[in-house]
Amino acid sequence: MLSYRKSQRVLLAEKLKKKNVIHVFGASGSGTTTLGKKICSELGYTLMDTDTYYWIPTEPPFKLKRSANERIELIKNDINKSANVVISGSLADWGDELIPCFTLAVRIEMKQSVRMERLLKIEQAIYGSRIEPGGDMYRQHVEFFEWAKSYDSGGAEIRSKARHDQWQKKLSCRVLHLDGEAEIDEKFKKVSEALGLFEERT
């Protein structure tokens, strides 16, 4: 017989299969959250960004990590409470338990130069002078940018193209590849087509 805890996991997995769970992933700055917000705005889905689950809220932010098990449980509980969801960000290396839940994966790819320009604008808009020389987040900002730049050339031990290539091979759902520089409406249209929704919305 299944243990109570294991049987509960099986029941939850079956329940999660009955809804759309879209995983949007790619390099930092490639627009995964932007596309996730667009999908949720248009289709009424719930947006779940992996950073929300990965990091414990601190000031300054991004200092303390949750354990992988805690992240997984929080994500599964939030999926269970929602009708349909988009999970934006990276789950590679710690989110394998969620793979059976996915009904569609969307991989966004973008040139490094464009990504880094977008990231700088985002960081400046959120943190302002805090990331400038002398600011309390300047060192953290510099380290973050060095990490983000390494996506295209880094090994599978970090969040990189190599790691996402490995992660993608594990996915059993359809994987849609999108150009991050395409217009947001064009990207949403392709997601809608992949979901079989576009004709119903035109």
Stretch-by-stretch model annotation:
Residues 2-18, 146-202:
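NTP-dependent small-molecule kinase module
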Residues 24:
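Hydrophobic anchor at the beta1->P-loop junction of P-loop NTPases
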